[in-house]
Regions:
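Short helices/loops that flank or line small-molecule/ion binding pockets
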Residues: 61, 80, 315-317
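Outer-membrane beta-barrel proteins
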Residues: 52-59
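Catalytic domains of carbohydrate-active enzymes, especially glycoside hydrolases
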Residues: 59-77, 252
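Non-catalytic, alpha-helical, charged scaffold/linker segments
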Residues: 89-142
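Ligand-binding clamshell of periplasmic/extracellular solute-binding protein-like
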Residues: 23-26, 59, 74-84
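Residue-level detector of functionally special positions within alpha-helical transmembrane segments
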Residues: 2, 71, 93-96
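Aromatic-residue-lined binding/catalytic grooves and analogous aromatic/hydrophobic interfacial grooves
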Residues: 68, 76-78, 83-84, 96-104
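Active-site loop segments of alpha/beta catalytic cores
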Residues: 1-41, 45-52, 135, 139-412
Length: 412
């Protein structure tokens, strides 16, 4: 099997020739640029710059040489874009390592803090001295009463939402006729250049975007106070996303294998809402988006990035049309690997949960890391329905020898 065949077999619940591996195939299976620079040095790779494609999380593009070293089977569609040197500009990581960042990122240093700004000069996020990542500092609707809104300005405020404004490569291309042509050309070239599975990030967040606009604690309160307004917002977001989804899939659907939607529905102690609230506030519109995507691209796997303890929601997610999810946060309440595999493994693909990044990967010995990986893979992988990745991104302070021990364990 080649990499694409391996991933597709797993997604179709067939046993592949070996466990498929994702390293940097999306924004929650990646590696912080500081850790990536150390990994390159440890591997003796002295060529190539460090390209930071996700400014908020400070994630590096994983180069083909390292994808080969770890045996990665997945690449993200965004690497098909920003291929010219002029598409990048110089910057320096918090530890002093030189790197490149996308040309369209508006960044400014004031004192010892770095600010990411919108095109019209609003501070959206800050990396304060001593920090390693950017945090949101501006919420467009923070003082707005949702009951008085008709949500007709959604497209406008997206430009002032940190995650939407600071797009990763590919996401910066508008869905105009010319933009869709560029997306299709890039996707076609990437498909022709790799036998790895291609994952395309669409987004389509219904629960998270209101938090980015109102501020998280405000929106969670509004869910209790103003249920009808929140449901109107879910409908408005769905209406906003749908034309873009149709254009985007028309352009890249023939070339990708997985479409990634996003919505963090869980926290460390379980879902951020009851199953009943999920069914009322989000499931109808998730279902519309996901099932429309499947209609437009039947061969493409419908995938959700969804952090946290989401076990009580999984049956509803499957019913809404979801086929797979990352990062499978096994240290959260309810996310016992054996239970997940036994309960849902015949109809749902777990993409993640392969190594505990909270305790084991950053702090464990090589032997402890390998045992952790062996134990988890032995639970998740039988019968297919599993793609390996560590639980979310590898953070800046993880030693390179620990990273390599993790991937060695998968190959073993």
């Amino acid at each position: 099997m080649n990499s694409k065949e391996r991933v597709i077999a797993a997604l179709n619940h067939h046993q592949p020739d070996q466990v498929p591996i994702d390293f940097g195939g999306h924004r929650s299976s990646g590696i912080a640029a500081i850790a990536y620079a150390k990994l390159k040095k440890a591997l003796g790779i002295t060529t190539g710059d460090i390209y930071v494609y996700d400014m908020v999380q400070q994630l590096a593009i994983v180069e083909p040489e390292i994808l080969d070293v770890v045996g990665a089977d997945v690449v993200e569609l965004g690497r098909a874009f920003l291929l010219e040197e002029s598409h990048w500009k110089d910057w320096v990581l918090p530890d002093g390592t030189p790197c490149k960042i996308p040309f369209y990122v508006n960044i400014e240093k004031r004192g010892k803090d770095w600010f990411l700004r919108s095109d019209d000069g609003i501070d959206l996020a800050v990396m304060r001295e001593g920090c390693l990542y950017f945090e949101q500092v501006y919420w467009p609707w923070v003082d707005v009463d949702p009951e008085k809104q008709d949500f007709s300005d959604i497209e406008e405020v997206f430009g002032h939402s940190m995650w939407s404004s600071l797009a990763v490569p590919g996401g910066h291309i508008p869905l105009t006729d010319d933009g869709c042509r560029k997306l299709a050309e890039g996707a076609k070239k990437l498909r022709e250049s790799t036998d790895r599975a291609i994952l395309g990030v669409f987004g389509g967040n219904l629960f998270e975007v209101p938090q980015f606009l109102y501020r998280m604690e405000n929106y969670l309160t509004y869910m209790g106070l103003y249920p009808e307004a929140c449901k109107r917002l879910s409908q408005a977001l769905c209406d906003f996303y749908m034309p873009g989804l149709e254009k985007w899939l028309a352009a890249v659907g023939p070339y990708i294998d997985v479409i990634l939607f996003g919505d963090d529905l869980g926290g460390q102690n379980g879902p951020l809402m009851s199953p009943d609230m999920y069914r009322e506030y989000y499931k109808p519109w998730h279902s519309k988006l996901w099932k429309r995507a499947k209609e437009l691209a039947p061969e493409v796997n419908i995938h959700l990035h969804c952090c946290g303890g989401i076990e009580p929601l999984i049956s509803d997610l499957i019913d809404a049309g979801l086929e797979s999810s990352n990062p499978v946060q096994i240290t959260c309440v309810g996310m016992d690997p054996q239970h997940l595999k036994q309960t849902y493994g015949d109809r749902f693909t777990f993409w993640g949960g392969g190594c505990d990044t909270r305790y084991v990967l950053p702090n464990g010995t090589k032997e402890e890391i390998k045992k952790n990986v062996h134990d988890l893979v032995s639970i998740f992988s039988p019968g297919g329905g599993y793609v390996f990745q560590q639980v979310h991104n590898i953070l800046a302070d993880v030693p390179p020898e620990n990273i390599m021990a993790m991937f060695e364990a998968v190959r073993e």
